[in-house]
A protein has these predicted regions:
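Conserved, well-structured interaction surfaces
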Residues: 93-169, 199, 216-222, 362-367, ...
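Extended ligand-binding clefts on enzyme/binding-domain cores
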Residues: 43, 58-67, 203, 246-247, ...
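Short, surface-exposed recognition loops and adjoining beta-strand edges that mediate ligand/DNA contacts
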Residues: 31-37, 64-84, 90, 171-178, ...
Length: 512
């Protein structure tokens, strides 16, 4: 029996530039509608489907009914942040992201309106788009540099998508290499394409590394046309992220250092990127420039974050773990990212002010997906893991000198980490991770770090967590838990005869 492949190519014939893409442009057509003699005939024409693919990364394009929490990369980063201990949801509000926060989505894998289907469908849609672009390389007209620019981005998008699938539907890489991960497709898929079995974690990461290495190679020497495009520096940043999860410290160091060297971005003072809503800030490596007809309105990041806008963010306030807030010095400029004096804080944590609309009336604000500060934190961690504490401290101080004039990590050393994220050891590695938690709060997806660091965590009322979200009698303290491994959607089992639901489904509960 053949798999009736449901992942679609984004329909973008009418979308010639990022700024002209409208919501209606995101209707999907079957993958075989993209002809090599048409949109992919030459590198210049290929920018149309490529731009549309990026457009879907910040749009409420999801076929599910829960589009207000399904708006691409920023939505999934927010999802992964509320799954940890640092970003507090003070209340259920309208319900968006609340069930992620409570770990109450895995049993809903039969519905197309919940996370399992949403993430699986999203990432495989991006993979399908990338595969169609990559398949056109031999016939695509253009200079070598022009074709490399298209192909390098397609490889990077496929690498990123499989990387996020691996982080969502399998346990972390190290120690789980032989466990099942996800099916791998590297060629265009159409109705009737035979489904693949789940590859192992090791096989999936081998594909990820193969793709991101090719992306880095192909993008080197090209010039980015738009901030939403993955360029050479951004591909290096993605390579560094992947290497961290694989505990390949040498690659993490090399890639992050090269990204710092070639990106032309600089560590920015907090005052230079207020609201985290502009891709024009000097520290932004990759992001989505939002224009008025692409704001997403209620299906957008700032709607969920900016409480002053009196939208979803006011009903379900995002606040920082008080314990983490207390790790900042009195002169730390990042203190302004949270407001402990907000009258609406009540019994929760401290109200976030880090993410703000640039214009509330028009729902405006760009999405930032990678900052240069992350590269310094990766380089610091990699140096520390490699035993070079002096080098690690230097990278950390490069960042912290722009955050807190009185900061010092001179006495920190070593790599010891507590079993729980709240079990502090005082090591240099722990200090780097603490600063990472503060610096990237709301941007990266905290649960991904908790997984790769193999720590458990807890939520307490003292941190500011509401009673309903304390995760009582759950396995959050066990780093080997399946609590944060999503179930595969029922639609995949219904359409893919290579999968056996009795053997291939991930545990619905916290343990296997």
């Amino acid at each position: 029996m053949k798999k009736i492949f449901k992942y679609m190519i984004v329909g973008l014939v009418a979308c010639t530039t990022l700024s002209s893409c409208l919501e209606s442009s995101l209707d999907t057509n079957p993958t075989d509608s993209m002809s090599g003699s048409g949109l992919l005939a030459n590198a210049n024409a290929a920018l149309v489907p490529l731009n549309g693919l990026y457009r879907s990364m910040y749009s409420a394009w999801s076929p599910t009914d829960n589009t207000h929490q399904c708006f691409g990369i920023s939505a999934y980063n927010l999802m992964a942040d509320v799954m940890g201990e640092d970003m507090i949801m003070a209340a259920m509000g309208s319900g968006w992201f609340w069930y992620d926060c409570l770990y109450n989505v895995k049993s809903r894998y039969t519905a197309t309106t919940w996370r399992s289907y949403d993430l699986w469908n999203c990432y495989y849609t991006w993979i399908s788009n990338a595969n169609y672009i990559l398949d056109a390389e031999e016939t695509m007209a253009g200079t070598e540099t022009e074709v490399n620019y298209i192909m390098g981005q397609a490889y990077a998008i496929r690498a990123y998508s499989y990387f996020m699938l691996a982080q969502s539907f399998a346990r972390t890489y190290k120690g789980h290499e032989d466990e099942p991960c996800c099916p791998i497709y590297v060629e265009p898929t159409v109705a009737g394409t035979e489904g693949k079995p789940r590859s192992t974690v090791l096989e999936t990461y081998a594909q990820i590394m193969n793709d991101i290495n090719k992306a880095v190679e192909r993008l080197n020497g090209t010039t980015r046309k738009h901030i939403s495009h993955i360029d050479y520096a951004t591909a290096l940043g993605l390579q560094a992220r992947i290497a961290l999860v694989m505990e390949d410290w040498a690659t993490a160091k090399k890639s992050s250092e090269e990204a710092i060297a070639v990106s032309k971005c600089t560590i920015a003072k907090v005052s230079e990127f207020k609201g985290l809503n502009s891709v024009s800030a000097p520290n932004v490596m990759w992001g989505a420039e939002i224009i008025s007809d692409q704001s997403g309105m209620y299906a957008g990041l700032f709607t969920h974050m900016d409480a002053d806008a009196d939208k979803y963010g006011a009903k379900a306030r995002k606040q920082i773990n008080k314990d983490l807030y207390g790790k900042m010095g009195t002169e730390d400029e990042r203190l302004v990212w949270w407001n402990p004096k907000d009258d609406n804080n009540k019994d929760g944590g401290y109200q976030q002010e880090k993410f703000k609309f640039s214009d509330i009336q028009t729902w405006m604000g760009d999405y930032v997906w990678m900052r240069i500060e992350e590269m310094y934190l990766i380089a610091a961690e990699a140096e520390c893991r490699l035993g070079n504490d002096a080098g690690a401290r230097e990278y950390l101080m490069d960042l912290m000198s722009k955050r807190d004039a009185s900061y010092s990590c001179a006495q920190k050393s070593g790599t010891s980490m507590g079993k729980l994220t709240s079990d502090y050891t005082g090591s240099l590695l722990e200090e780097i991770i603490i600063q990472r938690r503060i610096e990237l709060w709301g941007e990266f997806g905290r649960i991904y770090d908790i997984r790769r660091l193999k720590q458990g965590f807890k939520r307490t009322a003292e941190m500011g967590w509401p009673t309903d979200a304390l995760l009582v009698n759950r396995n959050a303290n066990d780093p080997e838990s399946y609590m944060w491994v999503l179930t595969i959607p029922q639609t995949e089992f219904d359409g893919n005869s290579s999968l056996d639901q009795t053997k291939d489904q991930n545990p619905v509960g916290d343990t296997k």
